[in-house]
Amino acid sequence: MRGVVSDRRDRRFRRNKQAILDAALEIIREAGPAALSMRALGERSDYSAAGLYEYFGGKDEIIAAVCEQGNERLTAHMRRADPSLPVADYLYEIGIAYIRFALENPDYFLLMFTVVTPRPTGALSPQEMLEGDSSFHILLRAIRRGIDEGVFQARPGFGLMEMAYAAWATVHGIAMLRVTSLRGYPMDFDVADREALLNFARGLQSDR
C-alpha cells in the first residue's frame, strides 16, 4: 500500500513540476526570459512562491530545466533520422531535423541558445565525447563514422572536432536566421537549406 501511495505522490510531483515548466515557457514566449520571476510564475501557475520552491531552487534552476527539456526534444528530433543511410545523407538528415526543430519550437530554441546555463567544466576524452547523449553527440558520431568509412577526409588542423564544429555552426546559423532575422522573408528556404547542407557535406568528402 505504501508503494502505491508513493507512486501516486511521485506522479503528482512530476505533473506539477511539468505544469510549472509549461507556465514558465508561456511567460518566456510572451515576454522573454527577463519577465520570468517567481512571483509571475506563481501567479501563472497558481502556486505561492513557497510552493514553487518545493519543486525548484529558484528562477535560474527553472530556466535551466526548460532549456534541458528543449535539448531533450531537439535530440529526439535528430534521432528520427535513419542511421542506416549513407553517412553524407545521414549528416544532411540530422541537419534538416535540427532546423525543423527550430522552426517548430522557436521559443525553446531561442531560449536554449540565448540564455547561458551552467556547463560541466573539464575536458572530456574523445571517447567520452562520442559516448555522450545529446544533439551534438549525434552529430559528432556521424562525423566520426564518415571519417572511419573514408568518406570524410580529416586533415591537419581540421579533424573530428573541427569538422563537427563547422557542421554545427553551419546548421545552427541557418536555424537561427530562419527564426529571427529572416522569419517571414519571402524565399524558398527549404531549397536553399538543402543546397547549403549538401554542399557542406561534399566539402568534407575525400577525393577517393
What are these regions (language model features)?
Residues 27, 73, 77, 81, ...:
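Short alpha-helical functional segments enriched in proximate histidine and acidic residues
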Residues 112-116:
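Short, flexible, mixed-charge acidic loops at enzyme active sites
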Residues 109-110, 121-129, 148-197, 208:
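Hydrophobic/aromatic-rich alpha-helical bundle segments in the mid-to-C-terminal region
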Residues 1-15, 208:
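N-terminal intrinsically disordered/low-complexity leader segments
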Residues 65, 79-108, 132, 160, ...:
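Hydrophobic alpha-helical connector segments
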Residues 16-25, 41, 66-70, 74, ...:
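Generic hydrophobic, amphipathic alpha-helix propensity
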Residues 19, 27-61, 65:
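Helix-turn-helix
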Residues 92, 96, 136-144, 161-164, ...:
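An amphipathic alpha-helix signature
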